[in-house]
Amino acid sequence: MEKVMLSFDKVSAHYGKIQALHEVSLHINQGEIVTLIGANGAGKTTLLGTLCGDPRATSGRIVFDDKDITDWQTAKIMREAVAIVPEGRRVFSRMTVEENLAMGGFFAERDQFQERIKWVYELFPRLHERRIQRAGTMSGGEQQMLAIGRALMSNPRLLLLDEPSLGLAPIIIQQIFDTIEQLREQGMTIFLVEQNANQALKLADRGYVLENGHVVLSDTGDALLANEAVRSAYLGG
């Protein structure tokens, strides 16, 4: 039987008096890529934020690795082998590539740190080439590689990706998605939040569709790609 790594059970969340999530239920099995698609303002980023403790769930339960983390502080959740690549990359622009990666591996022992940085450079040879370059002078695609690499330095078992293709050229998007596929092959569990529904669903084992804070559909990636309502709303017909 597949092990459930993450589950939301009827989770609601609010910003002040505005309800952003409405009794959302979903799960991610160990080793899966699960994608969440939806239009701008559907609540995708809020859902990731709620998983990370900000905003807090106002009702329901969030369970990670058999632990109820609903009321945990963000820092405690992040130390529980969860890492997020935020929308907009948010690299430390005045730091070099290597310094950014060091921030991601801040809690690693020296031997672990060296192993992880070697692994990140193997995934992203461009980062090794640019390791002494300031992050702020890099292209958007290189910054996205760095943001993913920085998250991987904490050796997560669950990687959260928030709109990794946003603002990138198609050739770079393909490289990023190829790397996500590689990570899955290495056993990582990935929760991918994407507006690029076509690419995301091709890659995903399963997917959820979020509309106005409600999960309205869930199925395999292939089934959602073939679904006429999904094609019409998110795949340009």
Curated annotation (Swiss-Prot):
Q: Which UniProt keywords are listed?
A: Amino-acid transport, ATP-binding, Nucleotide-binding, Transport
Question: Which stretches make up the ABC transporter domain?
Answer: 6-237
The record lists ATP as bound by: G38, A39, N40, G41, A42, G43, K44, T45
InterPro entries in alphabetical order: AAA+_ATPase, ABC_branched_ATPase_LivF/BraG, ABC_transporter-like_ATP-bd, ABC_transporter-like_CS, BCAA_Transport_ATP-bd_LivF, P-loop_NTPase
Q: Does the keyword Transport apply?
A: yes
Q: Per the record, GO CC terms?
A: ATP-binding cassette (ABC) transporter complex, substrate-binding subunit-containing; membrane
Q: Which GO terms describe its biological process?
A: branched-chain amino acid transport; isoleucine transmembrane transport; L-amino acid transport; L-valine transmembrane transport; phenylalanine transport
GO MF entries:
ATP binding; ATP hydrolysis activity; branched-chain amino acid transmembrane transporter activity; L-isoleucine transmembrane transporter activity; L-leucine transmembrane transporter activity; L-valine transmembrane transporter activity
Record's CDD domains? ABC_TM1139_LivF_branched
Concerning its family, UniProt says: Belongs to the ABC transporter superfamily.
Name the job this protein performs: Component of the leucine-specific transport system.
Q: What is the protein named?
A: High-affinity branched-chain amino acid transport ATP-binding protein LivF
